[in-house]
Design a protein with these regions (language model features):
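N-terminal active-site segment of His-dependent metallophosphoesterases
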Residues: 1-27
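Active-site glycine-centered loops adjacent to acidic/histidine catalytic or metal-binding residues
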Residues: 13-14, 50-51, 96, 138, ...
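Short acidic, glycine-rich surface-loop motifs adjacent to enzyme active sites
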Residues: 16, 127-145
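Extended active-site neighborhood of metal-dependent phosphoesterases/phosphodiesterases
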Residues: 21-132, 155-159, 163, 167-179, ...
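Histidine-centered catalytic micro-motifs
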Residues: 135-141, 178-188
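A short C-terminal boundary segment appended to hydrolase-like catalytic domains
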Residues: 221-259
Length: 259
């Protein structure tokens, strides 16, 4: 990753594995592994929280825990909240928290809560109306995964997409939304909806360190953003994107090695 010499790294969530049913002791060890990797990066990482980054969110009876399961992630990255915004190269990045803990057999779902939507309303009042926006989300807003790989997804669509994504997109309908970056499902995918590109960026672990996942090899998305002046040009003129495969080597840790 350092050899690419990026100006910025968007960490799309799931910095560790497990989270929902693993003990805090196990998760602490996995965070140490993640810390070893992240400290080797030469470029600033702007993180998004993923469902595996949660810390003991579910009790033994599968009900939601009363404590804040996001505290470990927030402490590690030095952030007060799991959603925020920042500007880079003329673009405003909106970093969202798309995981809602619900417990039960499907312990989470893709959802933007009311507090975050209220924050977004306030944030949009602060952002200049002509500033192009890049939306970053762990769980996808748009994906074909359920149509293409139905047995993998099962009966719960909230496992693979944000169920109230339109509550966010409707707030941005009169804004220059340039791009939506997504993660979670470990596939390399680009969709377009109403002229907006939705890019799902694969995963550095592929199929959890076991080769490709549904045709997508371990890798990462490389995006080149060109400064914008006087509004948005067509997508392919202002932003270029490609998926870069990473070599799978014995040095990559398997889940059992950090359990």
């Amino acid at each position: 990753m350092n050899s690419l010499q990026p100006d910025l790294i968007i960490g799309g969530g799931d910095f560790v594995h497990g989270g929902f049913y693993d003990s805090g002791r196990v998760m602490d060890r996995r965070w140490k592994v993640a810390d070893t990797f992240l400290k080797k990066l030469h470029t600033k990482v702007e993180p998004i929280i993923g469902n595996h980054d949660f810390y003991e969110p579910i009790l033994q009876d599968r009900s939601p825990s009363p404590h804040d399961p996001r505290w470990r992630w927030k402490k590690y990255f030095g952030l007060h909240e799991t959603y925020r915004s920042f500007s880079f190269r003329g673009y405003r990045f909106l970093m969202l928290d798309t995981v809602k803990v619900v417990g039960g057999a499907n312990p989470y779902r893709g959802w933007i809560d009311a507090a975050q939507l209220s924050w977004l309303d306030r944030e949009l009042r602060r952002i200049p109306p002509n500033q192009p926006i890049i939306l970053c989300t762990h769980i996808p807003f748009r994906t074909s995964l359920r149509d293409s790989f139905g047995p993998f997804v099962g009966p719960s669509p909230g496992r693979v997409r944000v169920l109230n994504a339109d509550s966010v997109l409707s707030r941005l309908k009169d804004r220059p939304l340039a791009l939506v970056l997504q993660g979670h499902v470990h596939i390399n995918e680009r969709l377009q909806d109403n002229g907006i590109p939705f890019i799902t960026g694969g995963a550095v672990c592929g199929k959890w360190w076991d080769g490709p996942n549904m045709g997508t090899w371990p890798g990462l998305g490389v995006i080149e953003i060109r400064p914008t002046v006087g509004g948005l040009a067509p997508f392919d003129e202002r932003i270029s994107w490609n998926y870069t495969n990473l070599p799978s080597t014995p040095a990559m840790p398997r889940i059992s090695q950090v359990a």
